[in-house]
Amino acid sequence: MTNIRKTHPLTKIINNSFIDLPAPSNISAWWNFGSLLGICLILQILTGLFLAMHYTSDTTTAFSSVTHICRDVNYGWIIRYMHANGASMFFICLFLHVGRGLYYGSYMFPETWNIGIILLFTVMATAFMGYVLPWGQMSFWGATVITNLLSAIPYIGTDLVEWIWGGFSVDKATLTRFFAFHFILPFIISALAAIHLLFLHETGSNNPSGIPSNSDKIPFHPYYTIKDILGALFLIITLMTLVLFSPDLLGDPDNYIPANPLNTPPHIKPEWYFLFAYAILRSIPNKLGGVLALVLSILVLAIIPLLHTSKQRSMMFRPLSQCLFWLLVADLLTLTWIGGQPVEYPFITIGQLASILYFTILLVLMPIISIAENNLLKW
């Protein structure tokens, strides 16, 4: 009798994706982040569902409903902080996942890579709308500032902003629709993640060497299931340490002040995971230019496959490209720091230099260095 795991239409899909999947024998811990992102997504959907049971998306009661969750709901505080800090863990895993893709040339699977970029945009939109929901000062002013950026679009900008707001300012209608979108988007993300996996399994996984591994495959289970469980354990331990010891470490104290349209906070800034893009936005004095730079800071990933000039796929054996990659990482950390600083000297200049360097590395230096490496190897 054949195994039901391999014959039943439903279990066959699971079997071919997570059990009998042929995987390269040499993929490192950097390949753990896909499964960790899946765990983050499930965790966010579950905690979010329980929060939505007690949350009210009305400007008069939103702030107090979050307070009510933390004070009166059974284990409400842990659900709320797991959701808030879970978003931070989600973005840490996302950035490391994208970084891995850049380092090892995973972008040479264009379909998987492009779906990944769409996923990144969708997750960023979801996180932004979620940040608005507690209706604190930073929620309100963050929503006002970021949605206002769309007014930079020529001709239709102002109408577009008012259409998104549902009025002439961020108000009740805005909060209600942001809650609706914040609820539905994670399910769209789940569908996109399934498509992401579908495209990945068409080609098979890349590996650190960047060399095809068809001649040397091992089954996903037990080798990589146990490896993923170890990664998941690290993720949960880190998250729970954050939640139980310093839940407000990554948040903004201003968000504990109820939203007040008549009082602007001294420094409006988004959550830490958007600071690099926010710094790029602020480094351009022109509004439309800043918005374009903001979008391009993520969209630039889409043309990375076209700029791949090296004859090797991975950076594993390319020390010059490795130096550039780590310079890019340092540059992104610098941008993150600048995004949280006030708009004054010397932070403005540092931000502008870091922004220029970011695009220069990705669009100019990487392709040039790759050609230089080809010549050094006499290829």
Curated annotation (Swiss-Prot):
* UniProt cofactor(s): heme b
What SUPFAM superfamilies does this protein map onto? a domain/subunit of cytochrome bc1 complex (Ubiquinol-cytochrome c reductase) (SSF81648), Transmembrane di-heme cytochromes (SSF81342)
The residues that the entry says bind heme b b566 are: 97, 196
What coarse category fits the chief subcellular location reported for this protein? mitochondrion
Q: Which UniProt keywords apply?
A: Electron transport, Heme, Iron, Membrane, Metal-binding, Mitochondrion, Mitochondrion inner membrane, Respiratory chain, Transmembrane, Transmembrane helix, Transport, Ubiquinone
Q: Does the keyword Thylakoid apply?
A: no
Q: Which GO terms describe its biological process?
A: mitochondrial electron transport, ubiquinol to cytochrome c
Identify its membrane topology class: Multi-pass membrane protein
Please indicate if the UniProt record lists Mitochondrion as a keyword.
Answer: yes
Look up the domain of life of the source. Eukaryota
Q: What does this protein do?
A: Component of the ubiquinol-cytochrome c reductase complex (complex III or cytochrome b-c1 complex) that is part of the mitochondrial respiratory chain. The b-c1 complex mediates electron transfer from ubiquinol to cytochrome c. Contributes to the generation of a proton gradient across the mitochondrial membrane that is then used for ATP synthesis.
Q: Under what name is this protein listed?
A: Cytochrome b
Species of the source: Ictonyx striatus (Striped polecat)
The encoding gene: MT-CYB
